[in-house]
Curated annotation (Swiss-Prot):
Glycosylated. Residues 102-561 are lumenal. The gene is CHST15. One of its GO terms (cellular component) is membrane. This is Carbohydrate sulfotransferase 15. GO terms for biological process: hexose biosynthetic process. It comes from Homo sapiens.
Amino acid sequence: MRHCINCCIQLLPDGAHKQQVNCQGGPHHGHQACPTCKGENKILFRVDSKQMNLLAVLEVRTEGNENWGGFLRFKKGKRCSLVFGLIIMTLVMASYILSGAHQELLISSPFHYGGFPSNPSLMDSENPSDTKEHHHQSSVNNISYMKDYPSIKLIINSITTRIEFTTRQLPDLEDLKKQELHMFSVIPNKFLPNSKSPCWYEEFSGQNTTDPYLTNSYVLYSKRFRSTFDALRKAFWGHLAHAHGKHFRLRCLPHFYIIGQPKCGTTDLYDRLRLHPEVKFSAIKEPHWWTRKRFGIVRLRDGLRDRYPVEDYLDLFDLAAHQIHQGLQASSAKEQSKMNTIIIGEASASTMWDNNAWTFFYDNSTDGEPPFLTQDFIHAFQPNARLIVMLRDPVERLYSDYLYFASSNKSADDFHEKVTEALQLFENCMLDYSLRACVYNNTLNNAMPVRLQVGLYAVYLLDWLSVFDKQQFLILRLEDHASNVKYTMHKVFQFLNLGPLSEKQEALMTKSPASNARRPEDRNLGPMWPITQKILRDFYRPFNARLAQVLADEAFAWKTT
């Protein structure tokens, strides 16, 4: 017998253990006539007449195609509503993610991320219209942030207690030669005495139709510099020296290097310094040859390419070499004197700190520390090189670095999250290895979501001072450069022994707007949260203190910024 599910199943009290099936209107052979539900429910249950337990499973069976017709019509309507609802929900979630508000939709991390603003950095201004909004947000999340601080502070304390600024073991010259046989065969031990830059003549065996830049890797992999090399190619044959039926080209290395650091104003310094008539830079502002290209690295995550030979690097200085050659070949003493004052510079901001390639090429490490560093090779060829370093409060440097290199979902929350993750990774390394081993650890550096290690200036500077004299360095602060450009540039001129500028030249150099400033869309994001700033200040404090001690200048402790 068939009965309607809405009105025909009744259970007696537990003690009776019986199930009675009676329709209120009596049994009906056709459930369409059920007086209670009027046939609106087409799902039928077939219940045996046997005694059943309360949790017994009822068997569901279809009772002919006519019974499913209404159900399918009902299901199609619901199904359309469900699909439409899913589409709306997907669009809402996508808008949250794209707007950077996805933190509320995701499972929270071990630390809570909220927001309230810190003071904007010295060089990067903030949009005033966003201040009230950031202030309101900070009030909401302040308690959550402060709850996280003790846990993060334990990580920082763990790192701090393991910091040791040890003296590195210097490699022998013969060991360096074994690593770079070709480079040592190309660059001579002595340079021309009447040139301020390290230059020498080498024989050119090609004909006047030979393209000297045909295989240059910088030309092959970078289209924007091809026009520069086209001009060099056309003028090449006219700048050769000829003697005894042979042809010679002048080769030069930089007289000085701007070696670091990233997001510390090196581009601005480069742009101003290149306005001086006695300064000639490489054809490319940042060749990154010493740290990356000579190992075949363009982007480390993309793997290794063919190594750029030293000849490709030397080609970048041909424009300056042509002018120096003119001076050396000039007939008048005045012309010789003018051209011989030219100095060559190079401004790769990776030179000071980036030694990530060593793990791929040097297998004789000591306790995880690299056996050779970039400065070892530069010193082997240029023991008298001049080195300029521009530094910045490492806390602000890191945030500027994050805003510049992060591609999407940038926010103060995301930055805070990445900082805490990087600190945890750095601590894990410090538990097993020395400070130097962790700073130069390629695996760690690639794993950290922000480049925490770049701000450890004291570690890098001490390693550079292990091979170069302190007098060969000019260490500048971006904060000082921003407040008094003229004073900073005069210090650079004096350090490089450059001649004075005319009033017009100096005005052009000092009044030009800052280069490579923060992008408007990044300024609109506002500053990092104060608790993030506090965490980073705690982390960098011992490194800044050591730097200030080495330089005998408390300004490099960044206590008041």
